[in-house]
Amino acid sequence: MMKGAMGCPVAAVMEGSFSCTVANRFYQLLDDESDPFDNLREAERCWQQRKNLSKVVARRGDPGSRGCATRRELQKQRKQLGTPAPPPQPGQKQAPKQEECGGKDNSRAEKEHKTAWRPSFMEYLSSETESQAELTAQSLFRPTAKLNYERPRGCGRGRGGMQGRGRGGGINKSFDGFDQRGKREFGRQNDNDKIEMELTAPMEATAKTAKSPGVSEGELLNKVAEGKPREEVVQEMTLDEWKNLQQQNRPKHEFNIRRPESTVPSKAVVIHKSKYSDDIQKGELEDDYHIFRRAVNDITFQLDINFGSLPRPGCGSRGARGRGRGRQMEETGPQPEAMVQIVAPNPDDPEDFPALT
């Protein structure tokens, strides 16, 4: 049951008849003829009037607001000028002035210079084509860091590897462990210098030997080759080019493979010759090839299998067991000699197996 405005007669009738009332939340629409949009339009009109009034007041200018603005400007000027420092006491050391260490203006200028000086990787990659004289002049004759007496007094060495006062002064400083100045480039130039020195040495040796009479050109080449080993010049190439170069320089293996020959060489010796190889005719092989097939090294047909020499076991040979029917060995007479059976016929022999016509 919702609580409604009991003063309203409609609410009292609804509560008496239906035991519940529907109350107006804002208690503004007390009659059915009033429109809720009228209230919204009235509120919007009042808000617009207040807005216009505030604009008019801002144009005319409030003397109180002007006074507040002037006070704020005066406070900003006082902060910029700064309060005068108290006179130094005799027992205390005087702090360094802002003019000596640079000040805020100098720090801003250093930041701008820092951002302008910061190099990129592409610049150093493109600088590989510079001349050797400029690199040697920069690396050898340019001081890497200022000496202690050259630094201004009171301005310590700060962090970072940039130029400027109070922040250290080295171009050779590396960024996050990586030297962007082109260290490998300078090393590469040194390698080139070494290679040039080594190349000029054998050239001088060849010039001296050329002056001496009675020396052939082959001996000169041998002397140059016997000298110091020549270092290979570093070249830039892709992986595919390097693989192709390795394939070209790789020696080719030549195998002496003997081709199969149908004829038997004259120096060949027959170790084992088959017994029936001469008796077999080619025609019979072609006719019986699909019926009988035997391996070349099959020796089963050469064995003589004879089962007549095996002794037969007796019933009582294991002793007098059971009812005593076992026979003793003395009772048996002398056994006759084993009969030799005839060798099995040879299937390949036409006499043993004549062809059926």
Swiss-Prot record:
Chain segments annotated as transmembrane: none
Annotated region described as Disordered, given as residue ranges: 56-116, 150-186, 313-357
InterPro entries: HABP4/SERBP1-like, HABP4_PAIRBP1-bd, IHABP4_N
Pfam families: HABP4_PAI-RBP1 (PF04774), IHABP4_N (PF16174)
Record's compositionally biased regions (Gly residues): 155-171
Stated family: Belongs to the SERBP1-HABP4 family.
Name of the protein in its database record: Intracellular hyaluronan-binding protein 4
Lineage: Eukaryota, Metazoa, Chordata, Craniata, Vertebrata
